[in-house]
Amino acid sequence: MAEGGGCRERPDAETQKSELGALMRTTLQRGAQWYLIDSRWFKQWKKYVGFGSWDMYNVGEHNLFPGPIDNSGLFSDPESQTLKEHLIDELDYVLVPTEAWNKLLNWYGCVEGQQPIVRKVVEHGLFVKHCKVEVYLLELKLCENSDPTNVLSCHFSKADTIATIEKEMRKLFNIPAEREARLWNKYMSNTYEQLSKLDNTVQDAGLYLGQVLVIEPQNEDGTWPRQTLQSKSSTAPSRNFTTSPKSSASPYSSVSDSLIANGDSTSTCGMHSSGVSRGGSGFSASYNCQEPPSSHIQPGLCGLGNLGNTCFMNSALQCLSNTAPLTDYFLKDEYEAEINRDNPLGMKGEIAEAYAELIKQMWSGRDAHVAPRMFKTQVGRFAPQFSGYQQQDSQELLAFLLDGLHEDLNRVKKKPYLELKDANGRPDVVVAKEAWENHRLRNDSVIVDTFHGLFKSTLVCPECAKVSVTFDPFCYLTLPLPLKKDRVMEVFLVPADPHCRPTQYRVTVPLMGAVSDLCEALSRLSGIAAENMVVADVYNHRFHKIFQMDEGLNHIMPRDDIFVYEVCSTSVDGSECVTLPVYFRERKSRPSSTSSASALYGQPLLLSVPKHKLTLESLYQAVCDRISRYVKQPLPDEFGSSPLEPGACNGSRNSCEGEDEEEMEHQEEGKEQLSETEGSGEDEPGSDPSETTQKKIKGQPCPKRLFTFSLVNSYGTADINSLAADGKLLKLNSRSTLAMDWDSETRSLYYDEQESEAYEKHVSMLQPQKKKKTTVALRDCIELFTTMETLGEHDPWYCPNCKKHQQATKKSDLWSLPKILVVHLKRFSYNRYWRDKLDTVVEFPIRGLNMSEFVCNLSARPYVYDLIAVSNHYGAMGVGHYTAYAKNKLNGKWYYFDDSNVSLASEDQIVTKAAYVLFYQRRDDEFYKTPSLSSSGSSDGGTRPSSSQQGLGDDEACSMDTN
């Protein structure tokens, strides 16, 4: 399955398109196998057969032939074929079902040595089942009980069973099948769970990335090395979630120990409280800590272990944990009387219970950090998007959690049907009150009490001037950031002068500009005319894409390797030139397989040559001149004649006689047939690359050439024809692609690898980038949010007067604000081609945030807020790391939460470009009646920061201008 190539029979383009099109509509089924294909290869195949394209003019052209399936771009390590991290579906790879893969493999083959990337379909969700392909397998750490230092890594699907893991561990640690053994799930440093239900899947068991599993073989006398531990676990109460209220104890025994000697254990922290048996998934929900209990741990200063890319969850949880009204509600067990198990929109109270258990553990004062493993598993059951171990968005997790807690704790048991009324010119106060009361009739929970506010939206029809006013509840405020107007790109300029190295430039271009803008910017720095530039994306030693001048720069991703080539439209004598893509290929000695016998290397060329006066000899000379900086020419006496001797044939070492051939026509004219190497760029088994030509030639001596030419497809993976060696003119155009074929010996002798990769750095790369204003005030973001806008053509409003959709004007305003105001800074922006994160520093006040001026309800109460928490994101979109700053409600001090680590923080650390979600608490009358934070009697004797540290007096409400 892994290899392919050779001369292959394949149906015509229309048949391929039809057969694959039907298969690509296959629905995901649990347990089915799907295959990953590099999206670049797949896009090339789509061009070749005209898949999903209205332009059928170039369908079937040989230069578009994709060659064998090549997934090398998906691997971080070509040898182990380990997938790169953070690959994105459709952008980096496409998924095809088994039958589609088999057809493509049969038609095109696969690059030599590459194994298929096959993955299983797994199912997520408790009520609504959701299937997805598990692209990244779960890495587990495996060890044997008697030697815990010998840890081996293995990858498993979440659909694999515990029995599958046991079988693999027996093989790894040489444990016979007839010998009894037990599996233990080890987390933190001293907590073990027995995995006794072998038919459970990895997903059912809640195993996570990097989880340590221990296999314990039975002693010869029938006892178990950990027997004492098991005995203790059978008497210790544990918090278990079981599948029904009447279920028996979980099959997973939870054990805590810190010292194991001769089968004995010393129990340390393993805190267990009364059991919770309502709902659940059949595993222990204990949150056991690493350190022994300590009376010196400040409640709330509890870190959360990273279970594998779960920092986004930890960040959101720390912010919510330090939201005093919500945390007090759970610590006082007020939630127990309000759990709504019958709400069809809820999760039977299980999310509320899981969250309550975690909050109680975090505020117990006994644990320095806990592993929120069971909480994450519960979340993943109801929200499949969070079930894996890929990086997610802390704000999206926060939105799900607030909504889930609300529905689990909704005091409304039966939601009434309400008919919405139009404002019809009624006063805003009346319409807003009606909207809020209607909202509370269906939604009444601690989340609504604490987090919900009211928007006012005004829409005006541009045609009939109809005004529509609505009031809608919100749980968090998403604020846009002023968009960057430009972007910085780093590109390589390849000059036409063959003696000059490529130069790397850093240029500033319009964010939504065109390729021509890039060329103009580069022209200003280099002095080369923009019209003489061609911009290309180089990938795996080939041109992935050659851009047109009017194409948008949003098609170019930040990670693309962009080369800009200086080309000529006319030659020195004024004749018309054509620019040809030229690849370096090494012909390798063929193994017995039928896979490709050549490999691309080096940086490809864009070569300008005469369009109407080109012979093989002049082409060879032009290429030799172009690569003379890093390719030395053989001396005449090395081969007995000059390498440029007139009449030399294409690549022959022996005597030859040029055959009479017709002038070569370009492949699109249909006069050439594919050579026998069409499918993979191969020769007949056992042949020398040059022998193909030698079969046709006899007679006069012919010198050695450094390389031979082949006309190839645009990927350089399939030969179309050899070039005529009879001295006649070549007919090539801009759609032609050439390959220089080298043998290994010649390449090692004459090709300077180091010099070929060498480049210069322009001063623009050496100078520090000019820092434009990178800060905005929070008030600027709010003003942008409340600015009137015109709806886009794809997002129109239906006007009831005009009876049609209109691009109305829309204005959003704030009508009422909640006790806890959650502000989401919209840092991430993306479209089909472009993904970006705005690293703008948003200046937000730590205290005294006065929102009153932005509330359009003139009779509203004062809205003054103090910051209590911040969720931070470091890095780029889809990757990076999440942390949190939060203010402890007991001692008034700020702390930095970085997964399991908690450290004291100062206020001047909080406002950074990483701030992503802000939590503000409203100043209410009752807020000031509480005991002062400095006298809270905290264990560390913390005091509230002084006004000099704060920059503002405690009671001084500032406007949002922080300058």
From Swiss-Prot:
GO molecular function: cysteine-type deubiquitinase activity; metal ion binding
Residue positions of motif Nuclear localization signal: 767-772
Superkingdom to which the source organism belongs: Eukaryota
Entry binding sites for Zn(2+): 461, 464, 799, 802
Classification via Pfam families: DUSP (PF06337), Ubiquitin_3 (PF14836), UCH (PF00443)
A single GO BP: spliceosomal tri-snRNP complex assembly
Major place of residence: cytoplasm
Region called Necessary for interaction with RB1 and RBL2, residue ranges: 459-463
Region (Disordered): 220-255, 637-698, 928-963
Annotated region described as Interacts with DUSP and ubiquitin-like 1 domains and is required for USP4 activation, given as residue ranges: 485-775
Phosphoserine, modified sites: 445, 655, 675, 680
Locus of motif Nuclear export signal: 133-141
Region (Regulates ubiquitin dissociation): 384-386
Compositionally biased residues, Polar residues: 225-243
Domain USP: 302-923
SMART domains on file: DUSP
Subcellular locations according to the entry: Cytoplasm; Nucleus
Keyword list, A-Z: Cytoplasm, Hydrolase, Metal-binding, Nucleus, Phosphoprotein, Protease, Repeat, Thiol protease, Ubl conjugation, Ubl conjugation pathway, Zinc
Domain notes: The DUSP and ubiquitin-like 1 domains promote ubiquitin release and thus enhance USB4 catalytic activity. However, these domains do not bind ubiquitin.
Protein name as catalogued: Ubiquitin carboxyl-terminal hydrolase 4
Species for this entry: Pongo abelii
